[in-house]
Curated annotation (Swiss-Prot):
Residue ranges of the propeptide: 22-48
The protein's name in its UniProt record: Mu-theraphotoxin-Hhn2n
Tissue-by-tissue expression: Expressed by the venom gland.
Cellular-component GO terms for this entry: extracellular region; host cell presynaptic membrane
Residue numbers carrying Leucine amide: L81
Gene Ontology molecular function terms on file: ion channel inhibitor activity; sodium channel regulator activity; toxin activity
Family per similarity comment: Belongs to the neurotoxin 10 (Hwtx-1) family. 15 (Hntx-3) subfamily.
Location within or outside the cell: Secreted
Assembly mode: Monomer.
Amino acid sequence: MKASMYLALAGLVLLFVVGYASESEEKEFPRELLSKIFAVDDFKGEERGCKGFSDSCTPGKNECCPNYACSSKHKWCKVYLGK
């Protein structure tokens, strides 16, 4: 009986410590998220010489990036599986 009470108390203390640690990490999360969003926006401004996944393309022209192929049915770049 005593051992189970100590075990339950230790579990509650552990739960409190883990909750406190995760809460302190969550305070930094919005700042990190915003910095990643703005970093992605800067990257979008650069133009590529090829078209990526689901970009529209013209079949027969080699417009898609490596490992992608222009689908003649849908007319967008898809992953080329080699079939």
